[in-house]
């Protein structure tokens, strides 16, 4: 791994993290039990990475600098698996089973569909 790759991942991760912070701050303001911001961030990340993979495959572009910037950096900073699991832990602890099932389903099912949508758009 060279220094340029590290910079690309660092910059993309910073932007993705700031966007996730902003989404979460404004979308979770009035919600008590459903962490909408994490879901929105994860779904956007799934869509972006689906688009990116399909675009690179369609035009046979080598996965280098911009790919690192967007997929590893931006999507890595934007999406948040650890927060997702922590949210599920709190829902289980507080016995919010219906919310837990909804949250789990939204993130996994819609996440998969958003990746597929991104791929279909660029195929």
Model-derived features: positions:
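Membrane-interface helix-loop junctions in multi-pass transporters/channels
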Residues: 1-123
